[in-house]
């Protein structure tokens, strides 16, 4: 009998403090559905499910026919399972980390360097930048998902400068006036002026930031108590961020960055040098294998202000333009493909109606990881006929060039996400 190249995985759960608590977390619910022995602690956060080979969360193999305990060990000894191009391009490593995130309190405002800058930062300060790789990311909403992403159109920033004097005070009159004057100029002039404004904010003295933030919080609180709607300056969000991160400079970032609320199935792609933050909700995420993060606020951690201000992409765009749209497969009516402009990963979303009795997962020249978000199936392959039961929360590794047949065991819709590398 051929050695199995398709097998279920037990994946690592990260209990970071910002995660949703207990069974409020989609991560916890997926875990409980897939593992009847899982004990969900209602007083603990379940922030991330990691599906991949990262050293801090290497997936365990749930197949007693396989001697290797973890996915990274198995891939090291079965290099052809990656796919020929993937193996050669990424030095025999799985190039992506696949995740589910359940966010209760905001993650830090951050950006990730491109490869060239990552190599430089890693050499200069490995304690802050642990590897030399870039870290593009994509998030696809499972529930309504709120985040900050990329610089707003300049017209919107100028409006906030008028409406929020505390914001203008930190930017400074000269930089703010210059931004207003360059609104109709070419993109290079706009980017330069935007960089100047953002740098003024980030380089403000902590004492001054705290003073201005306290003034703004007091003003919003008083106006709200008087029954006035403060949503034109994101009053409720500002108060929430200040409560969670009092005195943090990142509270003012909401006036610079687009605020997105993704509906389930909508996505945002975070390329190198784009400032972003996840605020609340559940999502599927995929990224290149890297831990390099340059933080900008909403964090007690190290903020490298000079690197941050120098590296960011100061190209304004609307929140609508920040949405990343999938393409529908020509071969499979149930398949949507989220294929970002980086080689490291692609995400496929499959929605199969419950009226279908069997669905075939097509073979790819890439290793892939499949996550069952909804539905119950029996999986089988042409090479190894041993059936694999999969239900909500189940995770399956699929070696390159392997197809998988999924037999629906009940008339309920399937929702499946699959991470792969399409070179």
Curated annotation (Swiss-Prot):
Active site location: 295
Organ and tissue specificity: Expressed in all tissues, but more abundant in heart, brain and skeletal muscle.
Pathway: Nucleotide-sugar biosynthesis; GDP-alpha-D-mannose biosynthesis; alpha-D-mannose 1-phosphate from D-fructose 6-phosphate: step 1/2
Entry's localization field: Cytoplasm
GO molecular function: mannose-6-phosphate isomerase activity; zinc ion binding
Domain of life: Eukaryota
PROSITE patterns tied to this protein: PMI_I_1, PMI_I_2
InterPro entries per record: Man6P_Isoase-1, Mannose-6-P_Isomerase, Pmannose_isomerase-type1_CS, PMI_typeI_C, PMI_typeI_cat, PMI_typeI_hel, RmlC-like_jellyroll, RmlC_Cupin_sf
Binding site for Zn(2+): 110, 112, 137, 276
Positions bearing Phosphoserine: 102, 108
Record keywords, A-Z: Acetylation, Congenital disorder of glycosylation, Cytoplasm, Disease variant, Isomerase, Metal-binding, Phosphoprotein, Zinc
Enzyme Commission (EC) number: 5.3.1.8
Cofactor(s) needed for function: Zn(2+)
Catalytic activity as recorded in UniProt: D-mannose 6-phosphate = D-fructose 6-phosphate
Gene Ontology cellular component terms for the protein in this record: cytosol; extracellular exosome
Primary site of residence: cytoplasm
Modified residues (N-acetylalanine): 2
Cofactor binding note: Binds 1 zinc ion per subunit.
UniProt-listed GO biological process terms: GDP-D-mannose biosynthetic process from fructose-6-phosphate; GDP-mannose biosynthetic process; mannose to fructose-6-phosphate catabolic process
Family: Belongs to the mannose-6-phosphate isomerase type 1 family.
Disease: Congenital disorder of glycosylation 1B: A form of congenital disorder of glycosylation, a multisystem disorder caused by a defect in glycoprotein biosynthesis and characterized by under-glycosylated serum glycoproteins. Congenital disorders of glycosylation result in a wide variety of clinical features, such as defects in the nervous system development, psychomotor retardation, dysmorphic features, hypotonia, coagulation disorders, and immunodeficiency.
Role: Isomerase that catalyzes the interconversion of fructose-6-P and mannose-6-P and has a critical role in the supply of D-mannose derivatives required for many eukaryotic glycosylation reactions.
Cited NCBIfam families: manA
Name of this protein: Mannose-6-phosphate isomerase
Organism listed in the record: Homo sapiens (Human)
Organism placement in taxonomy: Eukaryota, Metazoa, Chordata, Craniata, Vertebrata
């Amino acid at each position: 009998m051929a050695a199995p190249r398709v097998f279920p995985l037990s994946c690592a759960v990260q209990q970071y403090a910002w995660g949703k608590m207990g069974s409020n977390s989609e991560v916890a619910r997926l875990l409980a559905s897939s593992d009847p022995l899982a004990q969900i602690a209602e007083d603990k956060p379940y922030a991330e499910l990691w599906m991949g080979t990262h050293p801090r969360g290497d997936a365990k193999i749930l197949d007693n026919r396989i001697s290797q305990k973890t996915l990274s060990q198995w891939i090291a000894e079965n290099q052809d399972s990656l796919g020929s191009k993937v193996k050669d391009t990424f030095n025999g490593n799985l190039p992506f980390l696949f995740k589910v995130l359940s966010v209760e309190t905001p993650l830090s405002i951050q950006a990730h360097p491109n490869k060239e800058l990552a190599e430089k930062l890693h050499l200069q300060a490995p304690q802050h930048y642990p590897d030399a790789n870039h870290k593009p990311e994509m998030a696809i909403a499972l529930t309504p998902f709120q985040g900050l992403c990329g610089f707003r159109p300049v017209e919107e920033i100028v409006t906030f400068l008028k409406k929020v004097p505390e914001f203008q005070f930190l930017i400074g009159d000269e930089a703010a006036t210059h931004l207003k004057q360059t609104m109709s100029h070419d993109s290079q002039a706009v980017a330069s002026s935007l960089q100047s404004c953002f740098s003024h904010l980030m380089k403000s003295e902590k004492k001054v930031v705290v003073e201005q933030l306290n003034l703004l919080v007091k003003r919003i609180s008083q106006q709200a108590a008087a029954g006035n709607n403060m949503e034109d300056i994101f009053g409720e969000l500002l108060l929430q961020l200040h409560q969670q991160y009092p005195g943090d400079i990142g509270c003012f970032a909401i006036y610079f960055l687009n605020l997105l609320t993704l509906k389930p199935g909508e996505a945002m792609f975070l390329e190198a040098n784009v400032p972003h933050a996840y605020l609340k909700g559940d999502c599927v995420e995929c990224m290149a294998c890297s831990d390099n993060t340059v933080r900008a606020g909403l964090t007690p951690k190290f903020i490298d202000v000079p690197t941050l201000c120098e590296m960011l992409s100061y190209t304004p765009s609307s929140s609508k333009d920040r949405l990343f749209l999938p393409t529908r497969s020509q071969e499979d009516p149930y398949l949507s493909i989220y294929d970002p402009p980086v080689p490291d990963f692609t995400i496929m979303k499959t929605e199969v109606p419950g009226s279908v009795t069997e669905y075939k997962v097509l073979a790819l020249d890439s290793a892939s990881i499949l996550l069952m978000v909804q539905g119950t199936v029996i999986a089988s392959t042409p090479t190894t006929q041993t059936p694999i039961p999969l239900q909500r929360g189940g995770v399956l590794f699929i070696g390159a060039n392997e197809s998988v047949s999924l037999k629906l065991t009940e008339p309920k819709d399937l929702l499946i996400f699959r991470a792969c590398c399409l070179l």
